[in-house]
Swiss-Prot record:
The gene is thiM. It comes from Aliivibrio fischeri (strain ATCC 700601 / ES114) (Vibrio fischeri). InterPro entries: Hyethyz_kinase, Ribokinase-like. This is Hydroxyethylthiazole kinase. Belongs to the Thz kinase family. GO terms for biological process: thiamine biosynthetic process; thiamine diphosphate biosynthetic process. ATP binds at residues 124, 170. Substrate binds at residues 48, 197. It comes from the Bacteria. Keywords: ATP-binding, Kinase, Magnesium, Metal-binding, Nucleotide-binding, Thiamine biosynthesis, Transferase. The keyword Nucleus does not apply. The lineage of its organism: Bacteria, Pseudomonadati, Pseudomonadota, Gammaproteobacteria, Vibrionales. Signal peptide: none annotated. The keyword Kinase applies.
Length: 267
């Protein structure tokens, strides 16, 4: 795994816009529009494919698979498992968003099953979800975290080892735990959690960068954090933030990303 630095992150943004990778999303009803538009604004190509009948074809030519369990049910679960099998067969990364893990036994069980099955895995979650994945007691209110991101770093280290993956913890401070290093990013804005699907957007962008290279979640976290920060400065509230975020992702340039990014690496 490459140790990420600001120059590498900037180069990945340029490469994504050049390659325009296709990202397969099995995601929830609430955020499909948000995440598809964010992927398009950044320069990727989203497809919201949920049918098991076409998944083998989709994974043969796409760049990565995003699985979001936000509106989980008995119909979606086998489709998700089959999609992971196809991603493994095609050596594609799987980005898992274990929405509400810890809030119900079903969500926790399915999240762990997917994490166990995926060969090339990145987990993007809030602190409570990461702690629940690790098997510890977490405080959650539905799909929202009541634990702070820094309190979940130890659990993230355990999860990263258990599933041989990278773990992205979203919060006031974002943390990424890989097999080789830990990263801390201090971008973003306090208004961002008031837009539904912001974490799901984070997961989708992680899938886009995973489709073009050696992504662990650091690049997507950096890009969304800086873009969200800029968009919030131009917004009166969550409604305008949602629109301004798309514009900022579309307009984000290398100089702005380099200048504003607050990244700490512990290798």
């Amino acid at each position: 795994m490459t140790i990420m630095n600001i120059q590498y992150i900037v180069e990945c943004l340029a490469l994504l816009r050049e390659k325009k990778p296709l990202v397969v999303n099995i995601t929830n009803y609430v955020v499909m529009n948000n995440t598809a538009n964010a992927l398009l604004a950044l320069g990727a190509s989203p497809i919201m494919a949920h049918s098991q009948q076409e998944m083998a074809e989709m994974m043969s030519f796409s760049g990565a698979l995003v699985i979001n369990i936000g509106t989980l049910d008995s119909v979606w679960t086998p489709r998700m498992h089959f999609a992971v099998e196809q991603a493994n067969l095609n050596n594609k990364a799987v980005v898992l968003d274990p929405v509400g893990c810890g809030a119900s036994q079903l969500r926790t069980q399915v999240a762990r099953q997917i994490a166990e099955a995926a060969n090339k895995l990145i987990i993007r979650a809030n602190a409570s979800e990461v702690i629940a994945l690790a098997g510890e007691n977490a405080q959650s209110k539905g799909v929202d975290a009541l634990d702070s991101s820094d309190s979940a770093v130890g659990a993230a280290c355990y999860v990263a080892q258990k599933y041989q993956c990278s773990v992205v913890i979203s919060g006031e401070t974002d943390y990424i735990v890989t097999q080789d290093a830990q990263y801390k990013l201090n971008n973003g804005h306090a208004m961002m959690p008031f837009v539904t699907g912001m974490g799901c957007t984070h997961t989708a962008l992680t899938g886009a960068f995973a489709a073009i290279g050696d992504e662990s979640g650091v690049v997507a976290t950096a890009v969304l954090g800086v873009a969200g920060e800029i968009a919030a400065e131009q917004s009166a509230g969550p409604g305008s933030l949602q629109m301004n975020l798309l514009d900022t992702l579309y307009q984000l340039d290398e100089e702005t990303l380099t200048r504003r990014l607050k990244l700490t690496v512990n290798a």
